[in-house]
Amino acid sequence: MLLIFTDLDGTLLNSDDYGYEAALPVLKQLQTLNIPVIPVTSKTRSEVEVLREKIGLTDAFIVENGSAVFIPISQRNLASPQTQNWGDYDLMQFGFSYTEARQGLKAVAEALNQPLTGFADLTEAEIHQLTGLAPEDVKRAKDREFTEPFITPKNFTSLEIEQTVNQLGFQVVVGDRFSHLIGQEAGKGKAVQWLIQQYHNSQPDAKIITVGLGNSPNDLAMLEVVEIPVIIPGKKCPHPGLENRGWEVASASGCQGWANAVREICNSLNIYLN
């Protein structure tokens, strides 16, 4: 059994226009072969649900930087005693609630003695201006359940922000424009490992091979826990934070690189894709 875990922005989706057209033929063949393609992303459930419908994904997905795994109720065999019913899904939650994330951001701001601006503090127009997201996508990006992105303060180093956040019992993914405050138990690697184990539990006699595709250091934890990690490069080269790891680097950026890499891996495993 093959499991494909993938980041979205800059990996399955182009970084500049969020396009995915070049990956559609491969995605369609994977669905025909019942090979799960599992998004692992900082995006919200609302954002991923729309994308899944557009590109035909039907399996579980991991949101908000590994804060939660959503399993469609049609795949209840992957649930566990720790999961809870969440509408159309079984939910495995690793992160805090959104209320706790907002309270945490306030505590971090007080500890840094620096006002911090979270997504909830921004209007939809301001988020559109900062991110370039379409208005309807801004609404979905604001529909957060477990984490709070905030504008990265420029007068502190990444290390200073991380140390302050950790002392308060949270984690932070520091980015150039936005950072993400997440729960102490959350993380892409942990969520991926948990879901892999659920597949093992549901099919104990099956040989499971895991693939992971990502383009940034935020994907490291995911890439480190799969058997076949693949780096999707930027337009010029891979991210410096992913260099010198001996991992496969896709032949192109974005969705074209994703499609090329997945096709090559499948063919090497005698799963022949066109």
Task: Please give the residue ranges for each predicted region.
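Conserved acidic, metal-coordinating active-site core of Asp-based
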Residues: V108-V211, P217
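Mg2+-dependent phosphoryl-transfer enzymes with acidic/Ser/Thr/Gly-rich catalytic loops
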Residues: Y20, S179-N274
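Residue-level detector of anion-binding/catalytic polar loops
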Residues: P36, Q171, I228-P229
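Short, structured coil segments at secondary-structure junctions
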Residues: I55-L57, E64-N65, L168, V225-V226, ...
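Active-site phosphate-binding/coordination module
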Residues: Y20-G118
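Asp-based phosphoryl-transfer active-site loop
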Residues: M1-D17, V192, L223
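Short hydrophobic/aromatic-enriched beta-strand-loop microsegments
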Residues: T58-E64, E136-V138, P229-G234
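Anion (oxyanion) recognition and catalysis
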Residues: Q31, K106, E110, N166, ...
